[in-house]
UniProtKB/Swiss-Prot annotation:
Catalysed reaction equations from the record: 3-methyl-2-oxobutanoate + 2 oxidized [2Fe-2S]-[ferredoxin] + CoA = 2-methylpropanoyl-CoA + 2 reduced [2Fe-2S]-[ferredoxin] + CO2 + H(+)
Keyword Aminoacyl-tRNA synthetase carried by entry: no
Cofactor: how bound: Binds 2 [4Fe-4S] clusters.
Domain of life: Archaea
Disulfide bonds: none
Name the UniProt record assigns to this protein: Ketoisovalerate oxidoreductase subunit VorD
Cofactors required: [4Fe-4S] cluster
Record's keyword annotation contains Electron transport: yes
Keywords, comma-separated and alphabetical: 4Fe-4S, Electron transport, Iron, Iron-sulfur, Metal-binding, Oxidoreductase, Repeat, Transport
Amino acid sequence: MNTLFGKAKEEARVISPKSVDEYPEAPITLGTTLVNFTGDWRTFMPVIDESKCVKCYICWKFCPEPAIYIKEDGFVAIDYDYCKGCGICANECPTKAITMVREEK
């Protein structure tokens, strides 16, 4: 169990901000995928079966990178330059239209 006791608990209360305004200002940085490709270290890649896709866009909403985009026909596609192969899209897809396959390089 990860519980704070005694003095540590008191100190945690003292240094814990009560609101967002109490946090110190920090520089804003761009995420790595906005600047660099991240798909080259992927070991598994998602593959979309459009016959199973119902265009719910849950995969697009849950993708932590800008790797999934919506095509003109309404289906989703994957930009493998940015896909890290995390599998969140496949895990969240309600119709199992996305499967993860081993990357072949």
